[in-house]
Structure formats: C-alpha cells, structure tokens
Amino acid sequence: MTKRNHAIVQTIALLAGLLTLGWAGNALAFHDGGVAHCDGCHSMHNSPDNPVEGTPNNQLLKGSDASSTCLNCHAGPGSARSYHSLSTDATVWSPGGDFFWLTQSYTNTNWSGDVESDPDNMGHNVIAADFGLTVDGTNTVAPGGSYPASSLGCASCHNPHGRVDGGTMAGQLPISVSGSYGEVPAPGTIAGAYRLLGGGGDGSGLAAQPIAATAGFGETDVEHPAYGEGMGEWCASCHGDYINDSHKHPSGNSEFLNGQSTVYNSYVATGDYTGAQGTSFTALVQFERQETDVTVLAAAVTSTAGPDSGDNVMCLTCHRAHASAFNNITRWDMEHELLAEGWPTAQNLIDMGAVPNADYYGRDIATEFGDYQRSLCNKCHVKD
C-alpha cells in the first residue's frame, strides 16, 4: 500500500469513528425531553426490518405491546451510564430499579419452613409480552387505588411522547431540553418533564408532573436524584389511599421531617450517631426537598448533605418506582431483624444469575454498616 493510499484509509477510518460517536450520542438523546422521531417506536408500513409482517401490532408499534416497544431499547445490561431498566443479571442500579426482579424467585427456610419469594410483589408488574413480563397475578388493581393491573405498562407512568401539560396542541411551548438535568430551555421553549413522567393536562389522569433532577442513570450516595415537590402526590394518582388515609405512614408535601431530620443527619449505623448533616445523605433513604426550582435541584444531585427540618418524606423514601429485590418494592429488606441476614441471600443471587450484592446496588451491607445493622427505618426513627 502506498503512503497516499494508507493516508486515505486512515482518514476514512477516522471519519467513520467520528460518525459512529456522533450516532451514539444521538442514540443516547433519543427522547431529548420530548417526542422522539416516530419510526423509533412505530413502523409506518408494518415493516420494522424491511419485510412486511403478517399481522400488524396495535398503533403500528415495533413491539407486540407498548411496554415491549419501550424495552426494545431499554432492556440490556446496566451500568452507571446505562438507560436500561431490565437486565438479565440485576445490574441496573438506577433510582427506579431493575425489572429483573419480576422475572426471578428464590426459596429460603425460616422457622415456619420453606418460603418462596413472589416476584409479583417485587415491582410494578408492567405487561411486556415480548420480554416475559406479565400481568400481576395477585393484585387486580393498584394497592390503595383502582388502576387496573391489566392495563399497567410503562406508559401508565411515562408519557412516551414527552408532552408537558397537554403539549403544544394544548397551548404549551415546544420542548427544547430534557426536564431531568436542570438544563435551561432556549427562549420561547420549555423543558420536558422529569423522566418523561405523565401528568397534568396530558389526559393520563395523573397528578401534576413532579419536579426533580438527576445526575445520570445510576444512583449512589454522591450521584443521585434530587426530588422536589410533588413526587408523593404524583404516586398517589394510583395509590391514593396511602397518602390520604389515617393510620398510615405520612407522605407528601405537607409531611415535614421536622425533628426527624436531626435524627437522619446524626444516624450513621446501628449504634453510631456521630453523623453530620453535610455528609449524612444515603441513597438508600431518599427525601423530598421543598423546592420547585429545577436548577436548584440540579445543583443538589451530587450533594452528600442530609435534609433540613422543612424537607419531607415521600413514597420514594422507602420504595423504588420500577422494582427491587425486596417485597413491596422497598429499598431495603424490611422483613428481617438484621440486614446482613436478610433475603435474598448471597447464594440466592448466584442461583438467579445476579451479580454480587445486586440487591443493594453493589453495597456490602455487613462491611458498610456492620453485622448487626437493623432496618433503615432507624435512619429517621432511631429505635435500634
């Protein structure tokens, strides 16, 4: 090969690399805060891979149902920068959690005998037939509400078209930036909703879209969502009895932590109350800030500071939104006295094909908190 031809080949390779990077960047910004390009989810002539299919899907979707269409992109291995929500090894460590836990069960033995876990109880049972996710076999309606389990899918919570308060046809300005990262929209435009959540005037019946910001797709103590006002009320769109009725744990904009914030900030672990507010935050026990300015929230997504007395408890303080390793989609095992002895066990994780410590997002609970760490309810209530 001549030097000239070699130079041409190198130039072509460089351009190909740059184009690949460009396409990758565009792929990561597919929604970009609003409605994406239509053929990402729909097949205009029922030919998603060129040949015409025999039977079209509803709405000409590329999956057999809406959630399967979502998972065509959102299923895959997890990482700190992955937008996936369903893996095969429990590596999606996002704030919402991994739908992996809906596909697995395990058996352990206690004083009553063999106990088998119920995957229906580990998450929101979105129906995605192409990925083996089926209707909840236990609940026919949302606990604490009336939303039918047979209708539950990704679009029950997320607006796949990204409309804010009904979109432009309802008089809203066009969307120019994501609503998840505190970006400032260009003049004459608005930001999208946090994580494309539905609500407001979009016809979904959901409460007003909550205000929040996040640093990325993972969740750690130093990179995490900062939740503003309205998250509890939004969850109550389907689970209203849990936020309105008495004799249940309070949650919502008016449920201030008050003196419990002092407890949260001093609590490090069972028997260790040497914490300080500036470093007391743990992603295992989230809280909601009394804040509606998304730029302020965006500045808090890497904060290690705990709550003020005016911050409040919300549904996501104790639960995840998608799925978790624990009953009732909780963030930690609430059914065992000691977290280190909780379920799933290390052997359960191996048997399910999950990576080590996947239940706590890679955190070794015994190493971090000690062998005798009690429930993380004590982060606010310190009864241990």
Sequence positions of predicted segments:
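Cleavable N-terminal signal peptides
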Residues: 15-17, 27
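A motif-centric signal for short, conserved binding hotspots located
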Residues: 28-384
